[in-house]
Amino acid sequence: MTPGERSLIQRALKTLDRHLHEPGVAFTSTRAAREWLILNMAGLEREEFRVLYLNNQNQLIAGETLFTGTINRTEVHPREVIKRALYHNAAAVVLAHNHPSGEVTPSKADRLITERLVQALGLVDIRVPDHLIVGGNQVFSFAEHGLL
């Protein structure tokens, strides 16, 4: 990637980030959210598991990488996800991780951890509107495929 391309991507990320923090902009199901995730996660060489913390209006409070793994897996600990969601006083969280292979189809492990997280977060009244998998320039939505 050339320095000019890196600069362009950084400017695009800043623009999308500003847009996602504007009052009234809901984070879930927005094109900007998907673009932001693709720009942030598509080129990663290792799996990363990120959590996007939302308020009651599904507006972005904060987002962070909680876990980093290897080229084909990362270990996710529900306790840590809950702890950070409570720290941010989130009403909801969007889960996101990448597949460095570019294949966005969820694995059995992806489905199982999603179920565990939805159940665990539900115990403390935190909704999970979606879990997104980024692979290359594609995004798979658990919600859109009826898996939540």
Swiss-Prot record:
A motif (JAMM motif) lies at residues 97-110. Zn(2+) binds at H97, H99, D110. Gene3D superfamilies: Cytidine Deaminase, domain 2. SUPFAM superfamilies: JAB1/MPN domain. Pfam families: RadC. GO terms for molecular function: metal ion binding; metallopeptidase activity. Keywords: Hydrolase, Metal-binding, Metalloprotease, Protease, Zinc. GO terms for biological process: proteolysis. Residues 26-148 form the MPN domain. Belongs to the UPF0758 family. This is UPF0758 protein YeeS.
